[in-house]
Amino acid sequence: MTATAQQLEFLKNSIKSIQDYPKPGILFRDVTSLLEDPKAYALSIELLVERYKNAGITKVVGTEARGFLFGAPVALGLGVGFVPVRKPRKLPRETIAETYELEYGTDQLEIHVDAIKPGDNVLVVDDLLATGGTIEATVKLIRRLGGKVTDAAFIINLFDLGGEQRLEKQGITCYSLVPFPGH
């Protein structure tokens, strides 16, 4: 099943836009409204599974926290394992960490050292692509463990914030279901 224009418009219409959140001048795209509609949620998962079902994916990685909501069901649909990437001190076993830049400071992500095996073909899934910093850090973690990652999938791409171009420089092909301008 290839996504039709009608299906993609349905998904776009299921995402509410909130003006001046979290601060004045921002138009926030709220993917949780898509989750509230079981038809929209199911369709988003079906379309991602369909796109990657023959790609030889061996693991799906989702980044905290909304990446879990889309990554885990995509992994189930592909019949592969799901690996969470989390904020510091949230994973119980041995981890490695990657620090990345934020607008004002830094943050860090962690992954279990035994979650990705050398040669794993990994798909990264998240709810939204903005500047690409979080996904770039996630990709670095996967590659440090010997995983191969060439693709990242998103529900929303805020296309004018430069995330897709940033990730392309890292050899990542980005796919998103719903494009929006970023604010």
From Swiss-Prot:
It is found in: Cytoplasm. Its EC number is 2.4.2.7. Belongs to the purine/pyrimidine phosphoribosyltransferase family. GO terms for molecular function: adenine phosphoribosyltransferase activity. The keyword Chloroplast does not apply. The keyword Cytoplasm applies. Pathway: Purine metabolism; AMP biosynthesis via salvage pathway; AMP from adenine: step 1/1. PANTHER family: ADENINE PHOSPHORIBOSYLTRANSFERASE, PHOSPHORIBOSYLTRANSFERASE DOMAIN-CONTAINING PROTEIN. It is an enzyme of class 2 (transferase). Homodimer. This is Adenine phosphoribosyltransferase. Keywords: Cytoplasm, Glycosyltransferase, Purine salvage, Transferase.
